[in-house]
């Protein structure tokens, strides 16, 4: 159990090798941990508000964070210094590096009279002048705001999840929407995570379901049903498993009992859509989940401010569906 945040966790993410685990929370300070023994390596000080989202690039050199203080910040992972701070007109909700690491995308909230917008910036030779440079692409969202985002294959597209349950794919070169999912989800899309090969992604929604989609066509392949809002979902890199986490909305939580089973991590079979395991642990809703890149453990970040890393025992790998 990793204890280093004073307020609820908003997102956790492993780097590509899996030796580092990054966590962001509402307490303004993203942390980086050594995933093997849970040692905290450092914090990234600079935000003046909640940090909603973070992402680390392919080489673990740069970190991007999305802040409620109306800035997106680019950090040096090793030294913890701010490379660039990009001011926005409303709080930044999502951020992601492209696979190449040459570009980063971030989106702003639809608040205070500002519309939601998606920005793409070039981070190859990023320095403090990045805040004055014009983004390589800027797409205003006319309908509903973006609540989660992924880069598509070959850095050619961006997949966005919205607060009305819609999912769309945007062509990065043209700045146009190329695919729209329609109404597969009826609630806010809280999280989207790609499979290891990038051909599929799983969504987590407030409508109490997680769904598996094709990354190119947005065809809904599978649905994993629960009784409560799903805040996060992740796909195992080695087995046909999906883990879901959620619970009630934070403001509706009145009990701290873990016995009720509201705040468990729930494991489903990717193909058969059947739940086969639950793991307890958090005293409150789970806000973010991530599988370790080797698939032998997973991490969860909760409303209780803790990050829990749990390793699977041998029976997990021997579990064969009949």
Swiss-Prot record:
Q: Which GO terms describe its biological process?
A: formation of cytoplasmic translation initiation complex
- Which InterPro entries did the record assign? eIF3i, WD40/YVTN_repeat-like_dom_sf, WD40_repeat_CS, WD40_repeat_dom_sf, WD40_rpt
Q: Which residues form the signal peptide?
A: none
Keyword Repeat tagged? yes
Question: What Gene Ontology cellular-component terms does the record carry?
Answer: eukaryotic 43S preinitiation complex; eukaryotic 48S preinitiation complex; eukaryotic translation initiation factor 3 complex, eIF3m
| Gene3D superfamilies for this protein | YVTN repeat-like/Quinoprotein amine dehydrogenase (2.130.10.10)
The entry's keywords? Cytoplasm, Initiation factor, Protein biosynthesis, Repeat, WD repeat
- Its Gene Ontology molecular function terms? RNA binding; translation initiation factor activity
Q: Which cellular compartments is it found in?
A: Cytoplasm
Repeat region (WD), residues = 4-43, 46-85, 141-180, 184-223, 281-322
Principal localization? cytoplasm
Oligomer status and interactors: Component of the eukaryotic translation initiation factor 3 (eIF-3) complex. The eIF-3 complex interacts with pix.
Family under the similarity heading:
Belongs to the eIF-3 subunit I family.
According to its UniProt entry, what is the function of this protein? Answer: Component of the eukaryotic translation initiation factor 3 (eIF-3) complex, which is involved in protein synthesis of a specialized repertoire of mRNAs and, together with other initiation factors, stimulates binding of mRNA and methionyl-tRNAi to the 40S ribosome. The eIF-3 complex specifically targets and initiates translation of a subset of mRNAs involved in cell proliferation.
Provide the protein name: Eukaryotic translation initiation factor 3 subunit I
- What organism does the record attribute this protein to? Drosophila willistoni
């Amino acid at each position: 159990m990793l204890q280093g945040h004073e307020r609820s966790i908003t997102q956790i993410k492993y780097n590509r090798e899996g030796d580092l685990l990054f966590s962001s929370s509402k307490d303004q300070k993203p942390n980086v941990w050594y995933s093997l023994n849970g040692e905290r390596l450092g914090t990234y000080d600079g935000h003046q508000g909640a940090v909603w989202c973070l992402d680390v690039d392919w080489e673990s050199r740069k970190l991007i964070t999305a802040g409620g203080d109306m800035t997106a910040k680019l950090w040096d992972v090793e030294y913890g210094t701010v490379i660039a701070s990009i001011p926005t007109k409303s709080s930044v909700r999502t951020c992601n590096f492209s696979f190449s690491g040459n570009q980063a995308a971030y989106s702003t909230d639809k608040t205070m009279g500002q519309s939601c917008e998606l920005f793409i910036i070039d981070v190859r030779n990023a320095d403090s002048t990045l805040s004055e440079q014009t983004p390589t692409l800027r797409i205003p969202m006319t309908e509903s705001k973006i609540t989660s985002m992924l880069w598509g294959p070959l850095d050619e597209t961006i997949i966005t999840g919205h607060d009305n349950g819609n999912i769309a794919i945007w062509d990065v070169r043209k700045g146009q929407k190329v695919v729209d999912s329609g109404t597969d989800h009826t609630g806010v899309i809280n999280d989207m995570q790609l499979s290891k090969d990038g051909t599929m992604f799983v969504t987590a929604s407030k409508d109490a379901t997680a769904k598996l989609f094709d990354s190119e066509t947005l065809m809904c392949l599978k649905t994993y049903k629960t009784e409560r809002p799903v805040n996060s979902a992740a796909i195992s890199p080695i087995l046909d498993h999906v883990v879901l986490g959620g619970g009630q909305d934070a403001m509706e939580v009145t009990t701290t009992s873990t016995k009720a089973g509201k705040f468990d991590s729930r494991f489903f079979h990717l193909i058969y859509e059947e739940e086969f395991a639950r793991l307890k642990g958090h005293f409150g809703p789970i806000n973010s989940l991530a599988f370790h890149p080797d698939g032998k453990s997973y991490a969860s970040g909760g409303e209780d401010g803790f990050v829990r890393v749990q390793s699977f025992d041998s029976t997990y790998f021997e579990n064969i569906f009949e």
